[in-house]
């Protein structure tokens, strides 16, 4: 299926970032950690070329890599991934909108899992604030 998408798209098409991230998650679920890492890195390469519009996708990929490294027994690489993700979440380049809130909420639990409780709280509060300002109930 990836070959079909490759034939129908230009190299570097932003959709490959999401496709490669999803392929990485599939390989990760199958226990194929090296293949998963390769696809996360392919996704990262595409998204890096699309900065700054892809910053949140890059942050999520760093968080995904941290989870992968835990499963693969590569704990020494986890903190570096999470620190890069935090840097992006705190960046002034990222609009504080609904998509930001969604990604904050999506990643907050993972930060908590790794003991980054202040970051978990920071991301959760940021998401709640955005949802409240939009008239939504936080935590949904």
Locations of regions flagged by a protein language model:
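Amphipathic alpha-helical segments of tetratricopeptide repeats
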Residues: 2-7, 44-49, 86-91, 128-129
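Asparagine/serine/threonine-enriched low-complexity, disordered tracts
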Residues: 4, 21-22, 42, 63-64, ...
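Short coil/turn linkers that connect adjacent helices within long alpha-helical scaffolds
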Residues: 7-11, 49-53, 91-95, 133-136
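Conserved alpha-helical positions within TPR/SEL1-like repeat arrays
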Residues: 14-29, 56-71, 98-109
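TPR/TPR-like (Sel1-like) alpha-helical repeat modules
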Residues: 83-87, 112-135
């Amino acid at each position: 299926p990836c070959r079909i998408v490759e034939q129908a798209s230009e190299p570097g098409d932003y959709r490959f970032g999401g496709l490669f991230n999803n392929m990485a998650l599939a390989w990760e679920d199958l226990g194929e950690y090296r293949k998963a890492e390769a696809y996360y890195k392919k996704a990262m390469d595409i998204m890096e070329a699309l900065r700054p519009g892809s910053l949140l996708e890059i942050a999520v990929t760093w968080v995904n890599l941290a989870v992968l490294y835990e499963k693969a027994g590569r704990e020494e690489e986890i903190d570096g991934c999470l620190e890069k993700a935090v840097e992006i979440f705190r960046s002034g380049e990222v609009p504080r909108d609904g998509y930001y809130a969604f990604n904050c909420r999506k990643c907050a639990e993972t930060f908590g899992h790794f003991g980054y409780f202040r970051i978990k709280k920071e991301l959760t509060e940021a998401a709640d604030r955005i949802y409240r300002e939009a008239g939504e109930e936080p935590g949904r």
